[in-house]
A protein has these predicted regions:
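C-terminal SET catalytic tail plus cysteine-rich post-SET Zn-binding segment of SAM-dependent SET-domain
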Residues: 2-12, 125-172
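Intrinsically disordered, low-complexity regions enriched in proline, serine, glycine
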Residues: 26-29, 38-39, 49, 75-76, ...
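Fe(II)/2-oxoglutarate
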Residues: 1-9, 35-38, 45
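Cys/His-rich Zn2+-coordinating "finger/knuckle" modules used by eukaryotic regulatory proteins
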Residues: 15-43
Length: 172
């Protein structure tokens, strides 16, 4: 059975971790932030979610291992939608690049999902002495979005992602 088969996307509710233990049994831990419990998120993706170093930003995404430039840090997953209406996630909507003939889903809305750690990456804009170390990469043909390291990121660092001009036009 695949992870997709054993996991149902929900709206910020508590879900069972989708990972399996060393014995092959499904992990019994519950989580409300991603589809993996804290232990499996660290073990499988080498990530932690904890209080951000950005004042007022809430939770942030941190790497537990060094990340090399131009490599994926975390998937950016959520509900695939055709247009970013007000009832969609707003701050958590990522546009999937692609030609007009690409699949009908043009956006990933991570507001209501608990299946991806990428949504916890913050932006360092307007923060003294902090710079973004990653960016969002999206593709409508492959229907995926991900957080990618823009430069080498040391272990223990917060993943700070460039959100792009469209995001800041809505927030300035």
């Amino acid at each position: 059975m695949s992870r997709e088969d054993t996991y149902t996307r929900t709206s910020r509710s508590v879900v069972q971790c989708i990972a399996h233990t060393r014995t092959g049994a499904r992990c019994k831990r519950r989580t409300r932030r991603t589809n993996l419990c804290y232990a499996h998120l660290e073990k499988e993706q080498h990530l932690k979610i904890k209080k951000s170093t950005i004042p007022g930003a809430g939770m942030g995404l941190f790497t537990t291992v060094q990340r090399r430039a131009h490599r994926m840090v975390a998937p950016y997953t959520g509900e695939y939608v055709t247009r970013p209406q007000d009832n969609y996630g707003g701050d958590y909507v990522v546009s999937l690049n692609g030609p007009p003939q690409a699949p009908p889903y043009k956006y990933v809305d991570a507001r209501k999902t608990t299946d991806g750690a990428g949504r916890f990456s913050n932006n360092a804009r307007r923060q003294d002495r902090k710079t973004n170390n990653s960016h969002l990469s999206a593709n409508s043909n492959s229907r995926d979005a991900k957080v990618v390291a823009s430069r080498n990121i040391p272990a223990g660092s917060e993943i700070l992602t460039k959100y792009g001009n469209d995001y800041w036009r809505r927030h300035d």
